[in-house]
């Protein structure tokens, strides 16, 4: 709480950044009509035909066993075009000492519980804070800008359509930056294009390849920054560092956004369990920032706050930030609140006491904290308040819905999951994402095998398709399929599916409030829907209903075995398909890449 008081005092003395925002909207549709697309020469089909069936043996078995060997070769080929740079992944060795790692982990676990070690850690933390502040102050401009201007770009969060065609950049060089931006910021669900092994990653590697003479003069700092952002979102931090090195080698000066992204990578990487603190890496980037003459902004200061590990350091940091930067923004306040163990009530009090607008991130943080505190009713009231009164601040998106859906899915509450989905979709006009439907499948599975399990499962599938999402295989959907296939004695009829359509879409919170005691507070029409879902309190279930409402763990062992075998078969089919696709790339990467681009009409063929 001392940190919050320090923050309140700093806010009262210093200004608050209110930048003038200039926004440019960049959607995939900009590249679909009237723009000449790139062409590739026709390739020999015989060279790139992959085998019709691939057994997991021989060369394929080696690929499966080693996993990353192909990726390593691709990385080495890419980096070999940068001979002047010393990069560790040019020569990757299999020298990981597992026994040493175990010893270091046990040693770290023992020393962390030592009081002497904790004192040493605190002293080291405060020494790091002093050095961190020295570098940040050196990088901060002395000129105070009361009304900074900030240019932002707006991209679609996700798209279920194909990637826009690749423009011919020799004829339209001005499109290069925006095209890289779309590939990096919009998640293309079609054919898993934006996954780490998808086509987007291959396209970025191709467009930024050191030997690509067409795009070399078009690569600005923004292009490199967008690429760093893409690999950061996939936790490929090594590629981020390599792009940063390539950027400097090709003569492009990094800017403030570049270093902010690299520091953000360190924050994300620090959440992964390891024995070494990220202090040296943070200081390296700040020294590099100073050497390049790049100024730190409020985002740099906000990002670096995440590396502080004790209350004294945090309070000192806030005071120094107020003195040298001169202003704060709502994102910094959010970072302070997120890094502390504060209740939702404390977070809202800080905003009210300082007359700060509530941002989207802070709003979602409060909902998350309320749900962790088991205050479901209060969290749902806050969600309704956000829809009614905070429209000028931000628009609710799928993340707001998914905070609730994750809680309901973990508890197996299909009733509350459908109540939340319908309320958010129909009342709050929130568009779901793929994670939303995965939580519906999960809630259904954890609710157990009920009489109408198959009808509800089919309803979720139809609902997902109607929202523009294909029926992609996922963990909880496959698990639900296996339960219905082997654990349900009832056959799926059109009548039961039609009944599900009529009932389930009408389960809506009357006053925008969710409650764990939904059965007790429901009227007769809602109870009819809850009965259909099999969500009846245990004490009110009759014998037959209780027998129908079986959890998967209570099924006979032979049925459980059949379900496991079914899921393993689905997994094996997916693995085999992915392997066959990979085999074409292993045989000839360039030819297979061109073939896929042509087949998907991302490029033309001459």
Swiss-Prot record:
GO biological process annotation, one example: mRNA metabolic process
Entry superkingdom: Eukaryota
Location of the protein in the cell: Mitochondrion inner membrane
GO molecular function terms noted in the UniProt entry: mRNA binding
Ranges that cross the membrane: none
Topology within the bilayer: Peripheral membrane protein
PPR repeats: 220-254, 397-432, 433-467
GO CC annotations on file: cytoplasm; mitochondrial inner membrane; mitochondrion
Entry-linked InterPro entries: Pentatricopeptide_rpt, PPR-containing_protein, TPR-like_helical_dom_sf
Function according to Swiss-Prot or TrEMBL: Required for respiration. Stabilizes the mitochondrial bicistronic mRNA encoding ATP6 and ATP8, 2 subunits of the proton-translocating ATP synthase.
PANTHER family: MEMBRANE-ASSOCIATED SALT-INDUCIBLE PROTEIN-LIKE, OS03G0201400 PROTEIN
Any further remark recorded for this protein: Present with 1760 molecules/cell in log phase SD medium.
UniProt protein name: ATPase expression protein 3
UniProt source species: Saccharomyces cerevisiae (strain ATCC 204508 / S288c)
């Amino acid at each position: 709480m001392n940190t919050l008081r320090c923050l309140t005092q700093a806010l009262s003395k210093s200004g608050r950044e209110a930048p003038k925002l200039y926004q440019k909207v960049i959607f995939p549709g900009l590249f679909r009509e009237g723009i000449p697309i790139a062409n590739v020469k026709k390739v020999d089909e015989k060279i790139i035909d992959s085998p019709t069936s691939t057994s997991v043996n021989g060369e394929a078995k080696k690929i499966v066993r080693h996993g990353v060997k192909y990726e390593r070769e691709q990385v080495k080929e890419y980096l070999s075009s940068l001979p002047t740079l010393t990069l560790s992944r040019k020569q990757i060795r299999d020298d990981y000492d597992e026994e040493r790692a175990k010893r270091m982990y046990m040693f770290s676990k023992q020393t962390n519980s030592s009081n002497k070690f904790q004192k040493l850690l605190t002293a080291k933390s405060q020494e790091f804070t002093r050095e961190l502040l020295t570098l940040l102050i050196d990088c901060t401009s002395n000129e105070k800008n009361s009304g900074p201007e900030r240019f932002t770009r707006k991209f679609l969060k996700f798209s279920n359509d194909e990637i826009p065609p690749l423009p011919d950049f020799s004829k339209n060089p001005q499109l290069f930056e925006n095209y890289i931006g779309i590939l990096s910021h919009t998640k293309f669900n079609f054919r898993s294009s934006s996954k780490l092994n998808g086509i987007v990653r291959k396209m970025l590697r191709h467009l930024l390849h050191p030997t690509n003479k067409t795009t070399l003069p078009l690569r600005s700092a923004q292009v490199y920054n967008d690429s760093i952002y893409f690999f950061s979102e996939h936790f490929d931090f090594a590629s981020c560092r390599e792009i940063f090195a390539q950027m400097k080698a090709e003569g492009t000066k990094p800017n403030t956004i570049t270093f902010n992204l690299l520091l953000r990578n360190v924050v994300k990487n620090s959440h992964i369990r390891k024995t070494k603190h990220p202090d040296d890496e943070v200081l390296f980037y700040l020294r590099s920032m100073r050497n390049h003459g790049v100024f730190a902004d409020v985002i740099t200061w906000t990002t670096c706050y995440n590396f502080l590990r004790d209350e004294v350091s945090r309070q000192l940091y806030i005071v120094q930030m107020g003195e040298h930067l001169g202003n704060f923004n709502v994102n910094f306040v959010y970072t302070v609140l997120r890094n502390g163990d504060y209740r939702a009530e404390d977070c809202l009090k800080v905003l009210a006491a300082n007359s700060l607008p509530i941002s989207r991130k802070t709003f979602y943080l409060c909902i998350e904290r309320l749900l962790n505190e088991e205050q479901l009713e209060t969290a749902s009231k806050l969600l309704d308040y956000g829809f009614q009164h905070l429209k000028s601040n931000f628009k609710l998106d799928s993340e707001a819905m998914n905070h609730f859906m994750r809680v309901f899915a973990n508890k197996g509450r299909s009733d509350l999951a459908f109540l939340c989905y319908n309320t958010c979709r129909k009342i709050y006009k929130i568009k779901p994402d793929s994670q939303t439907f995965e939580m519906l499948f999960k809630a259904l599975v954890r609710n157990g095998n009920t009489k109408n399990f198959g009808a509800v499962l089919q309803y979720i599938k139809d609902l997902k398709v109607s929202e523009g999402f294909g029926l992609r295989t996922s963990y909880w959907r496959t698990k639900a399929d296996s339960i219905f296939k082997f654990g349900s004695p009832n056959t799926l009829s059109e009548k039961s599916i039609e009944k599900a359509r009529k009932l389930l879409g009408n389960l809506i919170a009357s006053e925008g409030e969710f409650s764990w005691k939904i059965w007790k507070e429901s009227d007769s029409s809602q109870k009819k829907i809850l009965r259909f879902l099999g969500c009846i309190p245990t004490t009110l279930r009759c014998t037959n209903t209780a027998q129908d409402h079986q959890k998967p763990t209570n099924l006979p062992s032979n049925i459980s075995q059949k379900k496991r075998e079914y899921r393993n078969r689905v997994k094996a089919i997916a693995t085999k398909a992915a392997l066959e696709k990979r085999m074409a790339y292993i045989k000839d990467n360039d030819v297979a890449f061109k073939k896929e681009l042509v087949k998907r009409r991302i490029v033309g063929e001459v």
